[in-house]
Every structure is written in C-alpha cells, then in structure tokens.
A protein has these predicted regions:
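Short, acidic loop-to-helix structural element flanking the phosphoryl-transfer center
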Residues: 108-136, 144
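Conserved Lys-Pro-Asp/Glu-containing loop-to-beta segment of HAD-superfamily phosphomonoesterases
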Residues: 179, 183-206
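Non-catalytic pre-domain segments flanking phosphatase-related domains
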Residues: 16-80, 255
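Asp-based phosphoryl-transfer active-site loop
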Residues: 78-88
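Substrate-recognition/cap helix-loop segment adjacent to the acidic, metal-dependent catalytic center
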Residues: 131, 142-168
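Active-site neighborhood of HAD-like aspartate-dependent phosphohydrolases
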Residues: 86-117
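Conserved small/polar residues in nucleotide/adenosyl-binding loops
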Residues: 238-243
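Bacterial Sec-dependent N-terminal signal peptides
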Residues: 1-24
Length: 255
C-alpha cells in the first residue's frame, strides 16, 4: 500500500503547476523512495571503487587540474564534496517543504543537528580508500562555523579523522577559501597526488569561473575532460538541483 500511495502522489503531482514547492516535493519523494536514487549512488561509488586501486598504483597519474608536474612521488589522496556527495540532506529538504520555506532557511541549524546519513555507497568507498593507504579529504562549501558539527556528523557515521592534518576544508576557513574550490585543491596537491575526485557539481572539479560560465561554455568544458569522467572524476546527479547553485536551483550541495 505504501508503494501504491507513493505512485498515486507522484502521478497527482505531475498535474500540478511547476512551482518551486512542487519541484522540491517531487525531488524529495524521488530521493526518499526511489530505487533509481539508490542505484545511481551505489553504481557511481562501485565504479569509483573499481577504478581506485589502479589509480593508486599509477604514479604518473593525477586527477587534479591544479597538479601538472612533480607529483609522482607524493602519497595518494582522494577529494570528496560533502553535501549530496557524502552526506544526504534529504531530511532538511523535506523540512523546508513542510514549513513552506526555502534554502538557506534553517540550513545551519540542520547541519548542527549532526543527523545526516551517508549517501549510499560512501561508507564502502571510504573503507576501501583507507585500506589502500589513500588520504581522504573533504572539500566543502559549508561555511567554517559548521566545521565542528560536520566533523562530528562524519565521526558519528564511523569516519576517523587524522590528528595530524586538516582533512575537512571549509569555505571561509581561510580568507582565500572562497566558493571556488581551486585554492583548496591546490593546497592538497602541494603534498599529495590527487588520484580521484567525487562531487555533485561541476565546480567540484573545475574553477568557479568555468562553473559559472554560460551553458554552452560549461558543456564544452565538460566535454574537454571526457577521459576523466568515470575514470577519476565521478559526479552524482539528482533530479532536484541545489538552491546553492548559480545556474540551477537544486537540493543543498556544497558546490
């Protein structure tokens, strides 16, 4: 009966006007209920796990555009975005809809609750990376005031942070750490060979200027890196774009 009820709600919503609230509700139902959401996430992380061992072994390979030479002797690292890449914020999205509000209302409060769950496939990927001796870095556009809560949330899910380095790089943690993640990727590239990057927004892989360019320019840029996608770059895609996005209005993502 629950499945039938969901289908009836979903079909009924198709007849509604395309309001922001309607789009948000459709996306929330999709993420909460659908096999497609689960299979998309698991599929991407399974593919990433298949590729990771060989990338670790190939000392002459880097996944970072910021890293052009002198990296072969550096230890391997992976970079992951957090929101809708590692942590699932669908409960926050549902809360917005229930209260008739829009992002960023209540965003900081939600993060400080430390209740987000892993996206499907994340836990297994992080375990594999650790077993291969790969350092894990999280580069997020959550703001610096949310660092402790974000760290706590990840630790509650079982991730163990190093006591010797900063693996959680927040927006605004340093003056130069803006919405553009380039400087943070460069900082990691100074000491590590970046073998893989995982995100849910083009800006998790390229500069902010490229990410905020025209649709045609963004598409051309994406095509320029065909050999990276599905090899060392993995992008999770959801039907609901993040409100934080400059080009689309989607579920909170750290892009």
């Amino acid at each position: 009966m629950k499945t039938n009820a969901f289908v009836l709600i979903f079909i009924s919503l198709l007849a509604l006007p395309e309001t922001k609230g309607h789009q948000g509700l459709m996306a929330t139902l999709f993420v909460q209920k659908s096999a497609e959401f689960y299979s998309n996430s698991i599929g991407i992380y399974n593919s990433a796990m298949d590729k990771l061992p060989a990338l670790v072994e190939d000392k002459n390979y880097t996944a970072a555009l910021e890293q052009t030479s002198g990296f072969s002797g550096k230890p391997p690292a992976v970079i992951l975005d957090i929101d809708q890449t590692v942590l699932d914020n669908i409960a926050y999205q549902a809360r917005l809809i229930e209260n008739g509000r829009y992002y960023p209302d209540g965003w900081d409060a939600w993060c400080m609750e430390e209740k987000a769950y892993y996206i499907p496939g994340v836990e297994e990927f992080l375990a594999l990376a650790t077993s291969l001796g790969v350092e894990v870095f999280f580069v997020t556009n959550r703001t610096a005031n949310l660092e402790e809560a974000t760290r706590n949330n990840l630790e509650k899910l079982g991730f163990s942070f190093s006591t010797k380095l900063d693996q959680l790089l927040m927006k605004g943690e340093k003056p130069e750490w803006t919405s553009d993640k380039t400087s943070r990727r460069q900082l990691i590239a100074d000491d590590y060979r970046i073998v893989m990057m995982i995100g849910d927004n083009f800006g998790d892989f390229v500069s902010l200027d490229v990410n905020r360019s025209s649709t045609e320019q963004r598409n051309n840029a994406a095509k320029a890196y065909n050999e990276m996608w599905g090899h060392s770059w993995f992008c999770l895609l959801y039907t609901s774009p993040s409100p934080r996005d400059a080009t689309l209005s989607r579920m909170p993502s750290s892009a």
